[in-house]
């Protein structure tokens, strides 16, 4: 990895996620003592995509660590849209299920947008339902998508101010880039979102106080593209042929320029998963209050 510069601080998502998990474990135990109930997350996995299987396993292990119940449904690649919608409907109507999550990407013959919209917004712990996205845009309380929520928590934990800062976000996905840009905007940043059609990404990154990237391209962000003292948030996860897992940033060199940087792994990844657990607990508590 090379020696970091003396001044750079690694944004340790793993350590922060561990602390939040301990807190969740305590809360869930207290709820269980009082009500004999536990939050329960339903996870739907379609097909055998290796990365999806890995992510689902990580989510389930995290549920186990905090004492949250889960229900995992693994479905064949060739399941019909109607069958999947029917399963989601069952989970929506099941009072013991607090949150419903469909692991993306889905096979080509299934319309992901329609599936996201089929989940009850009150159980949409991924924060992908149009109603929750709309609430995010209008700053109403909603389930925040887990990765952007995790990024904001990580920056907050390290007292990295966002108000008045220039932020460059590379990647305009509905899951990460767009909601993250909205959270940054809500926190008072001036935000530029770059994507495949952006003429000169350097122009945006070199002027940014905070650079967030999540597109799935190793070494996309080089040290020369960063201004001295930038905060670098690497949301990319790439599995290299030699078995290494790296992000989208040339970490070895970028850490010589940055003031703060997330490692990959152990940076944003653990924060994503713990944010999902937090959303599930919030969903559970809201449903209990409604006498659901």
Curated annotation (Swiss-Prot):
Keywords assigned: Amino-acid biosynthesis, Histidine biosynthesis, Hydrolase, Methionine biosynthesis, Multifunctional enzyme, NADP, One-carbon metabolism, Oxidoreductase, Purine biosynthesis
PROSITE patterns on file: THF_DHG_CYH_1, THF_DHG_CYH_2
Catalytically driven reaction(s): (6R)-5,10-methylene-5,6,7,8-tetrahydrofolate + NADP(+) = (6R)-5,10-methenyltetrahydrofolate + NADPH; (6R)-5,10-methenyltetrahydrofolate + H2O = (6R)-10-formyltetrahydrofolate + H(+)
Cellular component terms (Gene Ontology): cytosol
Single biological process term from Gene Ontology: methionine biosynthetic process
Gene3D superfamilies: Leucine Dehydrogenase, chain A, domain 1 (3.40.50.10860), NAD(P)-binding Rossmann-like Domain (3.40.50.720)
Recorded metabolic or biological pathway in which this protein acts: One-carbon metabolism; tetrahydrofolate interconversion
Listed InterPro entries: Aminoacid_DH-like_N_sf, NAD(P)-bd_dom_sf, THF_DH/CycHdrlase, THF_DH/CycHdrlase_cat_dom, THF_DH/CycHdrlase_CS, THF_DH/CycHdrlase_NAD-bd_dom
Binding-site positions, NADP(+): 171-173, 196, 237
Pfam families for the chain: THF_DHG_CYH, THF_DHG_CYH_C
Annotated GO MF terms: methenyltetrahydrofolate cyclohydrolase activity; methylenetetrahydrofolate dehydrogenase (NADP+) activity
CDD domains given in the database record: NAD_bind_m-THF_DH_Cyclohyd
EC numbers, comma separated: 1.5.1.5, 3.5.4.9
Subunit structure: Homodimer.
Family stated for the protein in its record: Belongs to the tetrahydrofolate dehydrogenase/cyclohydrolase family.
Functional note: Catalyzes the oxidation of 5,10-methylenetetrahydrofolate to 5,10-methenyltetrahydrofolate and then the hydrolysis of 5,10-methenyltetrahydrofolate to 10-formyltetrahydrofolate.
Name recorded for this polypeptide: Bifunctional protein FolD
Organism: Helicobacter acinonychis (strain Sheeba)
């Amino acid at each position: 990895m090379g020696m970091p510069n003396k001044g750079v601080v690694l944004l340790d998502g793993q350590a922060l996620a561990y602390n939040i998990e301990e807190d969740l474990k305590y809360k869930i135990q207290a709820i269980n003592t009082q009500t004999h109930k536990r939050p329960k997350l339903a996870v739907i996995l379609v097909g055998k995509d290796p990365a999806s299987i890995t992510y689902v396993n990580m989510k389930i292990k995290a549920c186990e660590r905090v004492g949250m119940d889960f229900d995992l449904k693994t479905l064949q690649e060739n399941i019909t849209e109607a069958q999947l919608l029917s399963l989601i409907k069952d989970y929506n109507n099941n009072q013991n299920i607090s949150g419903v999550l469909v692991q993306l990407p889905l096979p080509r013959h299934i319309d992901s947008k329609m599936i996201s919209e089929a989940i009850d917004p009150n159980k949409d712990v991924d924060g992908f339902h149009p109603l929750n996205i709309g609430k995010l845009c209008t700053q109403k309380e909603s389930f925040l998508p887990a990765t952007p929520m995790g990024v904001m928590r990580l920056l907050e934990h390290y007292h990295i101010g966002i108000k008045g800062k220039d932020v460059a976000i590379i990647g305009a996905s509905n899951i990460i880039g767009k909601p993250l840009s909205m959270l940054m905007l809500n926190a008072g940043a001036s935000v530029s979102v770059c994507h495949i059609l952006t003429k000169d990404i350097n122009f945006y990154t070199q002027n940014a106080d905070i650079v967030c990237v999540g597109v799935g391209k190793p070494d996309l962000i080089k040290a020369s593209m960063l201004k001295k003292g930038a905060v670098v948030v690497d949301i990319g996860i790439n599995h290299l042929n030699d078995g290494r897992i790296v992000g989208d940033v040339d970490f070895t060199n970028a850490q010589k320029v940055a003031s703060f940087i997330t490692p990959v792994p152990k940076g944003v990844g653990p924060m994503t998963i713990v944010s999902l657990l937090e959303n599930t607990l919030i969903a559970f508590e809201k449903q209990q209050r409604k006498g659901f």
